[in-house]
Amino acid sequence: MHMTVEEMLRSSEVQTAENGLVYAVVESEGTDATAVPRMVEAVPRSLAGRVGRTACYFVPWLLKEGRGIIISGEDATPAEEDGQKALCHHLDVRPQGSLLIISLKFYENDGYGLAMEFFDKIAYVASLAEEQRDDFYRLLERQMRDERSGELTPEAAEWRREVIEQRGRGEAAEESLTNYHRAAETDALGVYMAALFTDVFFEDLFDDEESTPPILPEQFYDRVRTLERLYPANRGYSLQVVRQRPRRSSSSR
């Protein structure tokens, strides 16, 4: 089974979750989508309105073919000689409504990876909304004055560095500040939503090879708690952020 994005949109049965998020699952033999409804419902109701008319489609395989993408239900290796490449997701942001497509087979046996991908992209779309999140922005300003602080991702760290350097030269930093706010909010919001759905371990959020300093744990929790106040968890969900994975005691080895 192969179909274009247009064919997928015409043939898929779209559902509206209780939080207002629109989604659909394109199923095929061997595709496990049992966790999708609860994952979608984890997006706080007060946040779902910020993603506008975004529609999320969960498909078996998502392949890049030339300049376009196709949806496949077959377990087949992408034909690289034909310009095919397996994709984890596709996000098309448009004013009239964004389209997010995520490959379930790409994240087969990796429910954590699937959740982080989904919530990160929802967080990014939400960060594009024009309304101000003053409480969160003020927190970022306070943390920016702390020279010890880091960020969740290199992108946010780079934008923050530009803001600090531009301000130090007495230059206007509005564009860099907007980009920093967006990057930092996307990072924290994605982790916050993921932590409503599954256990998130703070130490797993960073790559050992990254050159930028990681955010301090207490500053990370301040960001997450601020977002929790702005976007309370839906009924049946609660924040599950753990600082460190449990270690096996020597007596149990």
Question: What annotation goes with each model-predicted range?
Answer:
Residues 100, 108-120, 125, 179, ...:
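Active-site alpha-helix of zinc metalloproteases
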Residues 112-113, 124-164, 202-210:
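Post-HEXXH active-site segment of zinc metalloproteases
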Residues 17-111:
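Auxiliary, metal-adjacent structural segments of Zn-dependent hydrolase domains
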Residues 52-61, 132-133, 153-159, 241:
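Short glycine-rich, low-complexity/disordered patches
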